[in-house]
């Protein structure tokens, strides 16, 4: 993402059996009883666990801190308060004291950033997202599922060189490695903007979910440098 190429890292992580939407199931266990994280809330968002079916925002990962709600490679937020200077605004300072790196989509700038002509889809303006991702990082999102069953999720993202993620549900493996396709576009003359070519991966993940509260864990497996914005879940057909 903007400015993050200064932290370029080459990672060699073997990937096995990458699938488009592997479903292994996720039986309930005592994970929820022992889990110390809590659903995200602040002065603007007070709706409790994010709803499925519906659009789940990655930036609304759980409260609880490092090792509980998330694991990040370093304690600094390289988006909020760093790239986006602390100026008292909600977006620039969003969760700036936490290790997960967060930014938001910016429109109307010169040159264009997230409303650029190289997008595969145009994201909403001022959309918060998790970025600066690196292999080995993860974050938890508590959700409330309306009805038990299998759900399919579309991922809104950018990735300048591809990568892979994996999902757990309630502490149990729920997918195999899922390939994220690169959004790199050689026709874009601005190298930093390779982190801002937005795309929508339809039916990116399928999860079998119980009714009620569950915790989704998103694991970054390979490459990193992806921006993960939303997962839009609906009942699988």
What are these regions (language model features)?
Residues 2-12:
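Bacterial N-terminal signal peptides that target proteins for export
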């Amino acid at each position: 993402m903007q400015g993050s190429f200064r932290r370029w890292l080459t990672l060699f992580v073997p990937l096995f059996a990458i699938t488009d939407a592997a479903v292994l199931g996720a039986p309930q266990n005592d994970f929820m009883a022992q889990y110390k994280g809590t659903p995200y809330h602040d002065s603007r968002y007070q709706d409790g666990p994010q709803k499925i079916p519906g659009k789940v925002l990655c930036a609304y990962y759980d409260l609880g801190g490092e090792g509980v709600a998330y694991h990040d490679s370093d304690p600094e937020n390289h988006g909020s308060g760093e790239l986006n200077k602390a100026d008292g605004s909600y977006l620039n300072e969003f969760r700036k004291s936490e290790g997960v790196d967060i930014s938001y989509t910016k429109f109307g700038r010169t040159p264009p950033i997230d409303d650029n002509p190289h997008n595969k889809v145009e994201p909403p303006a001022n959309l918060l997202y998790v970025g600066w991702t690196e292999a080995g990082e993860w974050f938890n999102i508590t959700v409330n599922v309306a009805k038990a069953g299998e759900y399919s999720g579309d991922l809104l993202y950018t990735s300048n060189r591809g990568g892979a993620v994996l999902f757990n549900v309630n502490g149990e493996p729920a997918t195999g490695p899922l390939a994220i396709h690169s959004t790199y576009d050689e026709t874009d003359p601005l190298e930093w903007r390779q982190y801002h070519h937005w795309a929508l991966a339809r039916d990116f993940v399928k999860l079998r979910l119980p009714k009620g509260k569950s915790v989704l864990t998103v694991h970054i497996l390979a490459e990193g440098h992806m921006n993960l914005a939303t997962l839009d879940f609906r009942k699988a057909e």
